[in-house]
UniProtKB/Swiss-Prot annotation:
Taxonomic lineage of the native organism: Eukaryota, Viridiplantae, Streptophyta, Embryophyta, Tracheophyta
Residues recorded as bearing Phosphoserine in the entry: S151
The protein's name: Ethylene-responsive transcription factor RAP2-3
Primary localization: nucleus
Pfam (any one): AP2
Native source organism of the sequence: Arabidopsis thaliana (Mouse-ear cress)
């Protein structure tokens, strides 16, 4: 069945109502847009998805609000870095970017005092880049203000420890003397486990005199330099060699 057949069937009814016969062109012109949509089935589909039109309207409203100049989001507090306590006091705090924590600045009676405390701390932490509540005012810190702790920088490191350099001569003099054990002579046991230390500064004469006293020779020979050569000849040479070898 085509569209022309439907119109031809519909035409006699119209002629009876109005008393004259209408053509197909007149019938098409009299049909409104809603009837045409209903005739071809478009009206029923729009009824099934009414949310599309609502979403389009909401997006249009949002775009208009975004494009309106001069309207900004209203801040909860008038000043930066402050908040009101339930009992009426005003607290001030600031975030330290170097430590990554919020630093407590104190509690104040008014919002202006808390805002000034924030400005002082922001100036110390961020310097000239800080966003202040009162950029045109130069004010001292308010009462009950707790300054933020200063974080150590790389330039404040303690100086490096100095390396102590000791010359070779000083190190040799500072070495302790090692005792030289002497072996007992004869069958007696009174000379065992005796030791005498010979330091590097002793000369040969002092070593010989100490050896003579160890052998219980005449005490006058150690006091008289003229008789030193005679006493040396009386000492066995092998014993003197052992002493010198142990010293080396």
């Amino acid at each position: 069945m085509c569209g022309g057949a439907i119109i031809s069937d519909y035409a006699p009814l119209v002629t009876k109502a109005k008393g004259r016969k209408l053509t197909a062109e007149e019938l098409w012109s009299e049909l409104d847009a809603s009837a045409a949509d209903d005739f071809w089935g478009f009206y029923s589909t729009s009824k099934l998805h009414p949310t599309n039109q609502v979403n389009v309207k909401e997006e249009a409203v949002k775009k208009e609000q975004a494009t309106e100049p001069g309207k900004r989001r209203k801040r909860k507090n008038v000043y930066r870095g402050i908040r009101k306590r339930p009992w009426g006091k005003w607290a001030a705090e600031i975030r330290d970017p170097r430590k990554g924590v919020r630093v407590w600045l104190g509690t104040f009676n008014t919002a202006e005092e808390a805002a000034m405390a924030y400005d002082v701390a922001a100036k110390q932490i961020r310097g000239d880049k800080a966003k202040l509540n009162f950029p045109d005012l130069h004010h001292p810190p308010p009462p009950n203000y707790t300054p933020p702790p200063s974080s150590p920088r790389s330039t404040d490191q303690p100086p490096a420890k100095k390396v102590c350099v000791v010359s070779q001569s000083e190190s040799e003099l500072s070495q302790p003397s090692f005792p030289v054990e002497c072996i007992g002579f004869g069958n007696g046991d009174e000379f065992q486990n005796l030791s005498y230390g010979f330091e590097p500064d002793y000369d040969l004469k002092q070593q010989i005199s100490s050896l003579e006293s160890f052998l219980e020779l005449d005490g006058n020979t150690a006091e008289q330099p003229s008789q030193l050569d005679e006493s040396v000849s009386e000492v066995d040479m092998w014993m003197l060699d052992d002493v010198i070898a142990s010293y080396e």
